[in-house]
From Swiss-Prot:
<dbReference type="GO" id="GO:0034599">
    <property type="term" value="P:cellular response to oxidative stress"/>
</dbReference>
<dbReference type="GO" id="GO:0005506">
    <property type="term" value="F:iron ion binding"/>
</dbReference>
<dbReference type="GO" id="GO:0005829">
    <property type="term" value="C:cytosol"/>
</dbReference>
<keyword id="KW-0408">Iron</keyword>
<dbReference type="InterPro" id="IPR036766">
    <property type="entry name" value="Fe_traffick_prot_YggX_sf"/>
</dbReference>
<protein>
    <recommendedName>
        <fullName>Probable Fe(2+)-trafficking protein</fullName>
    </recommendedName>
</protein>
<comment type="function">
    <text>Could be a mediator in iron transactions between iron acquisition and iron-requiring processes, such as synthesis and/or repair of Fe-S clusters in biosynthetic enzymes.</text>
</comment>
<dbReference type="InterPro" id="IPR007457">
    <property type="entry name" value="Fe_traffick_prot_YggX"/>
</dbReference>
<comment type="similarity">
    <text>Belongs to the Fe(2+)-trafficking protein family.</text>
</comment>
<dbReference type="Pfam" id="PF04362">
    <property type="entry name" value="Iron_traffic"/>
</dbReference>
Amino acid sequence: MARNVFCTYLNQEAEGLDFQLYPGELGKRIFDNISKQAWAEWMKKQTMLVNEKKLNMMNSEHRQLLEQEMTNFLFEGKDVHIEGYVPPTEK
């Protein structure tokens, strides 16, 4: 049976993650408050961010930047700014 959470990103009830995907307190907060749909949206943004800024996950400063962007995106409603990216328009 699917686990539902009130997703703070979508601001509605939605299917929750199956297990904690991120370590520590932030991981618990994500597990308790973020839906599968919101996490999938973050993963797309994260991939674009890593590629555009050429982030190296072996570099602790790059990991901290990515974690801050994740927190801003999922919990504070701030979109990830990717220079030169123009989102497709809805039809």
